[in-house]
Amino acid sequence: MPESPIRKLAPLAAAAKKKGVKVYHLNIGQPDLPTPQVGLDALKHIDRKILEYSPSAGYLSYRQKLTEYYKRFKINVTADDIIITAGGSEAVLFAFMSCLNPGDEIIIPEPAYANYMAFAISAGAKIRTIATTIEEGFSLPKVEKFEELINEHTRAILICNPNNPTGYLYTRREMNQIRDLVKKYDLYLFSDEVYREYIYTGSPYISACHLEGIEQNVILIDSVSKRYSECGIRIGALITKNAEVRAAVMKLCQARLSPPLLGQIVAEASLDAPEDYYRDVYEEYVERRKCLIDGLNRIPGVYSPIPMGAFYTVAKLPVDDSEKFCRWCLEEFDYEGETVMMAPAAGFYTTPGVGRDEVRIAYVLKKEDLERALIVLRKALEAYPGRVKVNE
């Protein structure tokens, strides 16, 4: 089971704080923006004498309300198509365990969310990665590259759209390319779409559920964690029109009894958040994105493409090893009593040696803190003993 590149340096950050150093957390996608007040009010006003099990598939009222939410994105599903899970992570794990046998293979563009590997190991499956590069903005390679990986063990393709960790948004051409592969080889398409609210380029959001001809192959993964700053209530969803897959998933849901009761109450109420809540959150991320990307690309030797969605970017640094650099920032460096914590990007790749000069950065801090973190990062790079000379 691999370590999490997002969390494995947390003890070093805790030790730095204990010494009085302020740590700017750029490593983890924990939004700092407020949870919708309607969700908090629902939690505050829970008036129950018993906190009972909920149905294993989740409350019907919540699933019905979700269908209206998805219609806003032209995703037409019924309450029966939706299974509520304990976060998007459980949805991914249950999808793998329901659709894959030990030894089956999943094709995933890399870099990819690191926990996918852990879930695949739990399901006895194997991940085959297809390379995307920072130089190409993390766009997908040609279809022939996918077909080179497809064999008798291949059962699925997984995408995250918009992407974590890169912020890349798949184009219509790329989504059609994936559809054609799924249809040609009769594969499952696992599509993690938890960042659909956060698209910044004017390009269309194309859900896997929009792709014609593969409706029975698509398993959509969703979560309220990033949409409503509700990571702690652990509510996600697995959505598919494939009744056989739903039946298999329900066996796992029944074995784990029920998704979180209180979390469902908060999540259902949060669907009534006013439009200005979504607008204000979106506009804040637009501003933060510009602040971060402009600031990164002004630092000598640093390069980041412009992320099109989500609230992450992968940046290339002029360092010998980004994990060593991230550790050094926490253990040996501070600038005026402050330092930065980032996620070494090698942990988002399975190909050995790739991503060693890259980091994932989450722009989940207010603009003033991002500006200060960029100053601290610049000073850290100037002082780091393992800095590499690049053409600047």
Segments predicted by a language model, with ranges:
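PLP-dependent class I/II
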Residues: 2, 9, 16-24, 28-46, ...
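Generic structural signal for well-ordered alpha-helical scaffold segments
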Residues: 14, 67, 71, 96-97
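Basic nucleic-acid-binding alpha-helical/helix-turn surface characteristic of O6-alkylguanine DNA
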Residues: 49
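Conserved N-terminal alpha-helix of the aminotransferase class I/II PLP-enzyme fold
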Residues: 53-86
